[in-house]
Amino acid sequence: AARNHKNVFCEKPIALSYADCDEMVNTCKENNVVFMAGHVMNFFHGVRLAKKFIQEGRIGKVLYAHSARNGWEEPQPSISWKKIRSKSGGHLYHHIHELDCIQFIMGPATRVTMTGGNVAHSGPEFGDEDDMLFLNLEFGNNTYAIVEYGSAFHWPEHYVLIQGTKGAIRIDMCNVGMTVKLADGTEEHYCVHANKEIDDDRTRIYHSTEMDGAIQYGHPGKKPPMWLNSIMNAEMEFFNGVMHGDPIPDEFKPLMTGEAARAAIATADAATLSLRENRKVSVEEVMK
């Protein structure tokens, strides 16, 4: 498409290897077309607000982030393509939103260590993806992050926690809401999505579905929930605006060249190499 001078929208993960991502990004640059990655978490009201507060210095310098996206999965009637690593990359790639969100806030990771494996979902009724993964990210400036993924957790969690020198921000996507805690102990509360009705509906889904909300996935013909519908509409409205000449705000510029998506895949590839070779990996290793 890019070689034929067509603008591109690509869902996440944009590819399952850094080399493929790099070719996609460079081809779009060479042909001067937009390359938007579908990293829809950037359109959460709470995520945008958190970025704004961080830029304003409300929680000071960001020191550490911790995300968790995990739950428990029972055998399904059929094995989804998302459970086959060769097709989806497993949790690390098809749930790459939280990793992307953290790197949008803290910059690209420089070194990665990943541990985990398939601890509870082996057998013919399951795919071959790892069901428990822990990423330890280093950013080269004495700042760090932990990212958890998996479907082997009976206590489901889904959040991004950002710790700074003057406060902290927690974006909770299970008991849905955003909390800003300042150094004097005061707390401020905000919606994660466009309004409280949508937040409450997502909370209900997390506590009532057959599959924990952090790991559930859609099916053809299944209507998207309110929260997903609202952010998809925001994402497509933004993309349509850009296609018709609207300026791109600074916060979204890396999203519109594929560079942020490429950086997330680079970190994911480094994490995969770390797990396979049981060592700490510099992200630049996979970028050569």
Where are these regions (language model features)?
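Contiguous beta-strand/loop segments that form the cofactor/metal-binding neighborhood of enzyme cores
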Residues: 93-94, 99-186, 230-247, 268-269, ...
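Beta-strand-loop-alpha-helix segment that lines the small-molecule cofactor/substrate pocket
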Residues: 1-42, 57
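Structural detector of well-ordered beta-strand residues that form the stable sheet scaffold
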Residues: 9, 34-36, 66, 113, ...
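Short, well-ordered coil/turn segments that N-cap beta-strands
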Residues: 6, 33-34, 61-63, 141-143
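Terminal low-complexity tails and localization/encapsulation signals of metabolic enzymes
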Residues: 280-288
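C-terminal glycine/acidic-rich active-site capping loop/insertion
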Residues: 40, 166-259, 288
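Predominantly a Rossmann-like dinucleotide-binding segment in NAD(P)-dependent oxidoreductases
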Residues: 34, 41-127, 278
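Aromatic/hydrophobic pocket-lining residues that form π-stacking "cages" and hydrophobic walls in ligand
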Residues: 24, 50, 270
